[in-house]
Structure formats: structure tokens, C-alpha cells
């Protein structure tokens, strides 16, 4: 666990019994771990990530992301609050996000060879709401993985859960997602493409 600073940040990592998790290193904005699954899944790399909430320091987050993806031959997954969106469709309300700011995040993702893990639930994972009803909604939280990881876990989905105590949606990763036939609320593709 990485503690919060005031009301911002903080990371917690929970896993199911039977999964072997070895934390390699951690800092204020990340948890870097190796996962040893059972049976056919072997070993893979996991990173819990928190992007700097200060826009002036966001470039430091992208440099950290690039350094974490460095020379690693294992399949890997990164989940977290990146405090950034990839494209304008990931934001509702408020001022328009500068394109260059989003592009820097996308460049770091591309540098690491990461792809979106499909999600189930509301598109936006963060809500800012004033007493007068004004809202800003953004998709700040996500799961990204290498193609090798996605091949290893083809049914994996990230669930955006509802919360009454946080402005962020809790995230739950399921490796064996079976879609419901009644309601379509999942995303297997990136709306920014």
C-alpha cells in the first residue's frame, strides 16, 4: 500500500488467495510487482499507477511510466488513476483539455506498446460536482496492457464500479469475464481511435 497525501493519491493492491504477488518496488505514485499465477498463466508484470495531479508535473509521470516499461520480457499490465485523458470524448463538461497535454500521455502509452483492456460500466471514472449541479466527468482511471498480456488473458475486463464515498470509480479486474446478453455497457475498443 502507498499512503495518500492529504486527499490525493494513495494506492492499494488486493489480490485473490492462491495468487502469488511479489512487490518489486514502490514509490509515491506506483507499485511495481510480479505475479505468479497458477497453472497455464506463468509469471507476468503488474504496475499500479497514480499520475501526478499537478499538470505542470505530469511529464514526470510519463517519464516514470516509460522507465517502468523498460527492458522487460514478461507480459505486463498497468492499472491506475493516470489523471489524464487520451482524447476529448473522454471528458464531459468544463474547459477543453489542451490537445498537446493528451498527446503526451498517448505518446507514453505508445512508447510502452500498451493497449486498452476493455471495460464494463460507465465511460467516466471520475466526477467533480458542485452544489449547483455543475459536473465534470472524465475517464482518468484505466487498465493498459501489452499484447502479450492480452493474449494470455483474452477474456479480461476492467469493471468500473460505483462509489458513494469517492469521486473515482473503484476498479475491479476480472480475468474470466462473461458478458451479459441483455445490456451492452462494455468497451472493447478505444473511442479515441
What residue spans do the PLM features occupy?
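A shared catalytic/ligand-binding motif for oxyanion handling
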Residues: 1-193
Amino acid at each position: 500500500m502507498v499512503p495518500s497525501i492529504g486527499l490525493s493519491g494513495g494506492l492499494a493492491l488486493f489480490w485473490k488467495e492462491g495468487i502469488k504477488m511479489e512487490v518489486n518496488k514502490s514509490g509515491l505514485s506506483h507499485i511495481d510487482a510480479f505475479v505468479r499465477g497458477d497453472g497455464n498463466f506463468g509469471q507476468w508484470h503488474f504496475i499500479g499507477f497514480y499520475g501526478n495531479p499537478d499538470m505542470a508535473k505530469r511529464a514526470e509521470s510519463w517519464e516514470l511510466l516509460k522507465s517502468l516499461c523498460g527492458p522487460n520480457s514478461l507480459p505486463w499490465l498497468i492499472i491506475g488513476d493516470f489523471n489524464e485523458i487520451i482524447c476529448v470524448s473522454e471528458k464531459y463538461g468544463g474547459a477543453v483539455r489542451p490537445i498537446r497535454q493528451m498527446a503526451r500521455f498517448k505518446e507514453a502509452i505508445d512508447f510502452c506498446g500498451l493497449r486498452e483492456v476493455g471495460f464494463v460500466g460507465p465511460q467516466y471514472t471520475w466526477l467533480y460536482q458542485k452544489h449547483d449541479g455543475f459536473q465534470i466527468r472524465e475517464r482518468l482511471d484505466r487498465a493498459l496492457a501489452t499484447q502479450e498480456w492480452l493474449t494470455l488473458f483474452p477474456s479480461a475486463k476492467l469493471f468500473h464500479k460505483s462509489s458513494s464515498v469517492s469521486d473515482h470509480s473503484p476498479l475491479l479486474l476480472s480475468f474470466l469475464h462473461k458478458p451479459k446478453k441483455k445490456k451492452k455497457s462494455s468497451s472493447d475498443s478505444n473511442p479515441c481511435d
